[in-house]
Each structure stands twice: as C-alpha cells, then as structure tokens.
Amino acid sequence: MPKIEVYSSRYCPYCARAKNLLKKKGAEFIEIDVDQNPKERIVMERRAEGSTSVPQICFDGKLIGGSDELVALDMSGKLDELLISKGK
C-alpha cells in the first residue's frame, strides 16, 4: 500500500469526504491537521505548489490533489489501481 498523507482541517467537509473514501477503500493514511500544526501548513503549501486549500493528498510523496481529484480517480477506477499496484 502506498504511503498516503492527507493534509486536512478539522471542520472541512471536503477533508471528511476524502478521508471517508480512503477508509471505505481500506486504505491507511496519515492525517496531518494543518490547523493544529502551522508548520505543516507551510510544508503542505510547498508540496501543493502554493495551494492553501485542504485537503491536499499525497501518495508516496506525489501530490494527487484534493478531494475532487481523489473522487475522480475513484470514479475512473484508477484509485483502486493505485492502491492495488502498491500491494494493498
């Protein structure tokens, strides 16, 4: 399984949607709360090329985007491929 990092905020509905989808797929992920960890927000913004919106989701260090991009990957079947190809 890839190392999945989800930069999120506590009251963000898009973050909840992304995390729920990953949980539904049985994927383990590291949640990084950028509200509680301001230094992590800076890291997220660098990784996301300046984007300040959450969630920002990384698979094995590669940014895939936010909730909409994660859902699009799921709808196309590519999310399952990513999870399976990494040994899920």
Each language-model region and where it sits:
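Residues that form or flank phosphate/diphosphate-binding pockets in enzymes
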Residues: 16, 39, 65
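Structural micro-motif
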Residues: 49-58, 68
